[in-house]
Every structure is written in structure tokens, then in C-alpha cells.
């Protein structure tokens, strides 16, 4: 019987690499009885710990990764001291250099992106020009526009010494170490015990025996080999790809004129010819004291060989990768012999978002924890500490939700018989970047991994990004080129921004009591910050959520939604309505005692009518044979209408043929596909379909008629294609039973009494400059002549059209922001509601056996879309209110010209009644007998909005959107509201933009603890909406004035988006008339 089988254990660690050893050491040091099992021998090079050096780096773009790296620095010293080995890391510093524009979605983030975190953490750095790089380092032929960032708090890990130290410490603290012990199966026996089946091989490799050993807890730390344990034990496997990374050792020139690398270095350049097999990412180490003099490791940060199982590892190294490195050395480091002395390789396990997997195994009662994937060597002491805390306490003091096993809608897990859900990178091996868009500062509180310690139990996991969010991310990332030019400006004011602002003195003025304003107030109140809401409308709050109640009948359903009325149940909308997310608005309101009553919204039903060209069909009618008479054949012959070949198939097939090209391109070559999408922003939908379909204009007009409102194809094609992707998966829709304004009223009830001041029409926002020359407050003036108000920050949440009437000249806004406020396109939308004595459309007899229980009917008549209520269906005596006309764009402009005065509206109602009767094939007189009242609403003629919802024109997304996400030059005036969000046109855009504005305020004021609380209580937004480089931040005449306002000159929240996105594979078919009419 093997000696190690005699006992039960507190912890068994499966995998004896660096992470496993660090975990075993930490647990044993805490007094636990620990067994560490290694399938091979300790110190073997068959996994990821081969070679003699690794990078310890602290330059990260993401806040949370920078914080973890900073925390690890002290733990490396603690580990070295405990082992009695002294320094385990040689702190040489790190030079990052290369193309400052590299990294818009690339695997390494950006060259300049880490600077904000270095400043926030008080870590030194220096920006170098190309000439300075070549003067201080042995590099040559560096392009003149390239730049460098040197940071001293980085170093070379002495890998052999680290492994030896960890092994020695494990033995020192009583951990049993067993090699040639392969874990075959883990069973969870109870809430407090696991059983592990081990195949143990004798030293001579001849005799194998299987045994079982029990433990209270287990850790799987076998990294590339983890699926060999997970799959047989738990019936699923981790969707990971393993890179066979190659590196080479070159001989540097010796002697008095030796080639000396003073530090580690990393070079950022884009791929040659956009070919990922021609990567230009290279890194290197100086010659280290624990190896032969003048031997320097230099390597390509890419891997042509990628495998799924470590047992498929190739013999030798990949010559392609070595030759790429040799070419670069020959070109840029003439003092190094371009023939490698020798080459080495190591395995690097990776998942779709390039981050760690660090979590409890599901359904094991938190008895089994796992770690795998990512570039982890630099975090070894911290990972050992985290894993030991999870094993001992079931929680850790560090925020690790970014590394959760269930992130990405389960994209990491492949169950038996399933195909992978994620898309792994194909060539490049990202070293230190994540797909998550919002960082989380290390919280001082203890946070369990399966639930949060805050009252709401909110998870900080960043949501999966939609294509629309990815598009915005890319636009924001492209504005980093001038980053280094204003570091000197930041440094001049650094001392002024070194202390935290007083929360007591921090006041926020919110202009507008719509969804964005109310949501911002809820967040600020939760964070303990002062705020006031200034609403222009004396009659109501809620902005473009407007539930009108007809006065004649007071029953529950005598209502009509003149604004937002339906919500798709898709991941994008989680922040609004997902009750499974404790940070969603509906969850917050329910916890406050205001449950939002949702019911299904019927977007379309089979009996809905489609009436075009005088032809009436039902929504479930197939569109294969031109039933609506759009074809040349039905209109007098060739050239009279639409060519037959286009009309004798579902119109959706014609659109899908174009849109699917984007799906295929993004799947097959993300970078190329995304470039195509970016370029498409310059097109209108009409122009793109005409040029790229290519479809004749008659066909484009036909598609627009069937697909959406008249004139909407003149808007940006990028809007069309992103909606197509984002909403393709949405089958379920919701509405609010009793009126959407229940959301608004519930939000108001959660706020402190008296915080909303109605009738406050803002006329001017200006700066108040203190004695120091910094902007100390913003002053808000009002139309009623009352005394202006002072606030530290102002969030404007109304429409940009209404903001246009406010004097902002003193704020010195950027040109692009002023242009956006003036010219950003808002769509026109009109709703006309009719109240009847009864719901005749639900009466089977009245409708000849075809009642309509919700949904919509579509027509080419002026009313265009008729919407039947989804609430109160089938209930006796319920009010008969329907939307007789819901129009957008040109249709809305024309019908809206009759909205306003009573005589015009009487003409309009007669027209609507006639159209309604014609669509439903009933006499107008019959409907007149049932008619009670009407309500018309034109959002363009509304005094307080002057537009329905933002819908960008060609190029506006790429040209104007980035400026809308930034505050004013002093960091105190913030734009929110749906138009400033990537999800404009939807309530979720209002919520996300409000979150972003509050986050910016916390950044400017240096309130990092409140930023952690924000993420803890309110989760993350799925948008990359952090402020980026803009001309407004370069102006040296405007000093930023908050303790942390420097961030707004250089904070680039980079997102490497390639592996994060998966194009939809199965779009909903549009082969029946039910699809006609669009969504908005």
C-alpha cells in the first residue's frame, strides 16, 4: 500500500506545477493536511513551466489586472523571504515600445493604455521617443513615429529558483509530495468530502496501480492537462486551445562594446499584410545572472501550432516562429547573432477571452476548485493565496469574477455531445489582456466567488459584448495616437490631484428626470452622494416613457404607450429586466418593494394582417409567390415595378444574403470582417444594398417598404447590420402590465423626497473657477429667473436636441461634441391611439373567425403599422385601446404634420379610421359607432425632447459617437441619455449611459472605493464607454481639476475583442408576412 494512501486529507492538489505548488504551500502553511499529486515528476518541462525566465509585469490596460499585479509585488517578496532564498525576481524594469496606434482589438492591448493605471497606482514610468529608444537600447531601424513606455516596477522571474523554493516550502510545512501520480477521477461524496482515484506508477515506470484517497477539498491545477481530470469526473470539458509557444536564445555581442539589454522589452507592431501568421509582436529578456553570460531570450509572441490536447504536442519547435524571430533580430538588433544558440518551447492553455479560469467546479458543494489558462507565472504567489482562501473559507478577498467558469453564457464549458460555444483565437496568443470591458478595483471587503457580500448579492461579472458594443469599442480604441503628447500636461497638475475629494462636498446636478436621470440618481443615492434632479416638464417625469390614460374609463387597460412600450428579453437588456441579476433595475426595484409586473408582449400573431398594394394577407402567409403584387408581372410587365426574380422569394432572403456576408467574414477572419463593418458606417442602408447587393433601386425601395419605415434606409447601414446581429436571437418580448410608467413611478419612490424639481428649464451651464485657477463648480441657470445652482458635477440626460437650446459656450466643449449636439440624427416617430367601446379586433365573430390577440398589422397606407395591445387579452369588459398608427421617419413626418391643433387632428383621425377600416375590411361606419376618443403624440413636436430616439446617419457613429462618451475638459460636465450609448433607441442605452457618467465622476474625484462599490452593487455595463483621447483633453489652457481627473487625458479602456464575439449562425427566418414592418 502506498504510504500517502494511509490518511485522509484536508486538501488534495492535483497538479504539481507552480500554481499547484503555491496552493499546496499556502494550505500547508495554514495548518492543513495537504497532498500534492503530480502525474509526471516535479520540475518537469512538459507543461507551461519550462525554461529559466518569465516576465513579472505590472503594465496592464485593465484596472483589475493592474491592481492584481500590483498586489503580487509584495507577495513575491514574502515568498522569497519565507523560502530563505532572497529575491526571486530580478527587477530590471520593462520597456514597451512600438506603434502607438497598435492594439485596437489586438492581443496585447495598447502600447499607451497602461499609463492611467501606472499613474493611479503611483508607479513610475517614462515615455520615450523612437530616437531615445535607439540611444538607450540596442535597437535600430525604429520608425520615427514609434514610442516607448519604460516602467521600473517589472522584473525577470528566476523560474528554477521559484520552483525549488515552492517545493522546499511544501515539504517544510508538511505537505506530502507524490510524483508519477495521475488523477483519473474526482467524485464529490458529500457536502464535506471528495474521493480521488489515482493511478500511481513506480519509479521504474513498470508497475501501475489504482487507488482512492479522500479529502475535504481538492484543487485542480493541472492547467493544460485539466480536461483529463474534468471530463471523466464531471461530464464536461473546458473549451480551451493550447499554444505551443517557441522561444529562442541568442548570443549578444560580448566585449567592451557589448550589446546590453538593460531591461525586459516588448515590441508592438501590427501584422504584416494583415496576415496573423506574420505577427510582429516580439519580446525579450536581458542576459540573466543565473544563466550563461550574453545569452538572451528573444521570441515571437505568437504560436502557429495550436492543439486541443497536450498529449498531441509536437516534437521540436515550430521553425516558422523561429524564422520570424530571426528576421526581426536581423533587422532591429544588429548586435545579436541572428542564429539561435538553442530553442525551447512551452505549452500555453487559453480560452476564448484569454483570461484565467479560477472558480469552483459546479455541483461539488464548493469542494473542488480549479485553476487553468492564461499567462499566470507572474501571479503565482497571489494565485496560491487565492486558491488557498477558496479552499479554506469558500471565498477570497480578491475580485475574481472576471475569471468565473460560467462567464460568457457558458462559453467555456463543452458538455457531452455539444459543440463549442466560443471562438478561440487562431494564431496569436494574447499575453495580458482580457475581453472584459470594465475594470474592478480590488475591494477591501471579502467577496465570495459564488455570491457577493453586498446586500444585493450583485455579481461583478462583465457581460458578453454585443456586436454594437464591439463596434463602439473599436471606435474608441482608435483614438489613442496622440496619447503621449499630453503626459507632461498631466504631470504639471499631479500634486493638485493627489488627495481624495470629500464625499460630503460632492454634489451632482442631474438635468432631466427621464430614465437616465432617475437611474443616475438611484446609483448616486446608493453610493451616498448628494444629487438633485432638474426637470423641465411641470406635468410629469419619465421623459420618453409616457403612458397616457384615457379619462373616460378608469379601468387598468385604458392606457396607451406613447413612448417605450416593449422590451426584448435578450442579454443586452439584462441591466433593465433580468430578475436573475441582482444588479438589474427590476431586481433593485423589487427589493425596494416595487415589483414590476411584466407580461409577454406579442410582436406578431398569425391572424395579424398585411395590406400592401390593395392586397390583404395574413401574417403567416408565405412570401414565395408575390402575394402582395410587387412584381413586374403583377404591374404591367418588365420595368413597371420590381423584377420578378426578387419578389418570388421571401424578401428576408435578399437581406440575409447581404447580412450573412458579415457573419461569415466575422467568423472566418474577424479583423478583416470588422474592418468591413467599420467601413460600412460610411454607407446608408440604401447605398450599401444598391452597391454591395447589388440590388436595383426598385428592389431597395421594395425592401425598405417591407422591412421598415419610409426613409429609414437613408440612415447608417452600420445601424441596420448591428440591429440584425443583436436582435437575431430574441424571440421573447415583454411589456409592463398596467403601463410602462410603473417603472418610472417605482424609481421615483426609491429616491429621497424632494430630490426632483419640476418646471426647471435650464438655460445655461457655466464654469466657476476657484482661486487656484481650477474649475471648482459648474453653475446651472434657469429660465424662470430663480438663482442659479452650483454643483461639482452636472449630468445632462435629456436629448441632444433639447440640450441645443442650452448655452454651453463657457464649457469649451470639443468641436466634435458641439457638432454631435447640433447634428446627431434623431428619428421622427408618431403614435396615434384610438379608444373604442370594446376590443372588436379580439371578437372572433366580428373578425370572421380570425381574432387578433396582440401583435401588429402592417400596410403601405399612411398609418403604416397598427399595434394591438398585448395586455388584457381575453378579459371581459376590458377597454378597447389600440395604436392605429405607429410611424417613423418620413411616414411620421407626413402624418405628424396633422398633429397639434384640433381641426387638423380631426382630419387625421378620419384618415386613420378610413385606413383602419380598409386594412380590416370592415365598414368605416361600424368603427365610428364604436369610437370613443383619441390621442396623438409627435415626439418631434414635444417641447422637451424634439425627437423620438437617436438613429445615426452615415458616418455619425464613427465620427461623433466617441465624443459623446467624454466629459468636458474639466471632467465635470457629463452627457448621458440613450443617444450617448451604443444602444441608442432603447431604455437600456439610458441606463448604461447613466452608469458610465457616475463612474466617470468617481474617477475624476479619485473615489476608488466607491468605484468598487459601484461594480459590486450595480455590476458592469456591456459597453466600452470610457473617455478616450480627444482634442478637448489636449488643450493646455484647461487644467483638469479633480484628484483623479488626469485619467481623462489618458484613460483608454482597451478591449481585445476578437475572441469575444461569435456571429449568429441561425438567424430567425423571414419567409412569412409576419416579419414585415420592422421593430422600433
UniProtKB/Swiss-Prot annotation:
SUPFAM superfamilies xrefs: FAD-linked reductases, C-terminal domain, FAD/NAD(P)-binding domain
Top-tier EC class: oxidoreductase
Catalytic activity: sarcosine + O2 + H2O = formaldehyde + glycine + H2O2; L-pipecolate + O2 = L-1-piperideine-6-carboxylate + H2O2 + H(+); an L-alpha-amino acid + O2 + H2O = a 2-oxocarboxylate + H2O2 + NH4(+)
Compartment(s): Membrane
Residues involved in substrate binding: 886
Binding site for FAD: 10-40, 535, 544, 563-564, 978, 987-990
Residues in the signal sequence: none
Location of region: Putative L-amino-acid oxidase: 450-1080
Chain intervals for the UniProt region annotation (Putative sarcosine oxidase): 1-450
Superkingdom field: Eukaryota
Keyword Flavoprotein: yes
Gene3D superfamilies: 1.10.10.1620, 3.90.660.10, D-Amino Acid Oxidase, subunit A, domain 2 (3.30.9.10), FAD/NAD(P)-binding domain (3.50.50.60), Guanine Nucleotide Dissociation Inhibitor, domain 1 (1.10.405.10)
InterPro entries cross-referenced by the UniProt entry: Amino_oxidase (IPR002937), FAD-dep_OxRdtase (IPR006076), FAD/NAD-bd_sf (IPR036188), Flavin_monoamine_oxidase (IPR050281)
Function per UniProt: Catalyzes an oxidative deamination of predominantly hydrophobic and aromatic L-amino acids. Metabolizes sarcosine, L-pipecolic acid and L-proline.
Name this protein carries in UniProt: Putative bifunctional amine oxidase DDB_G0291301
Species annotation: Dictyostelium discoideum
Taxonomic placement: Eukaryota, Amoebozoa, Evosea, Eumycetozoa, Dictyostelia
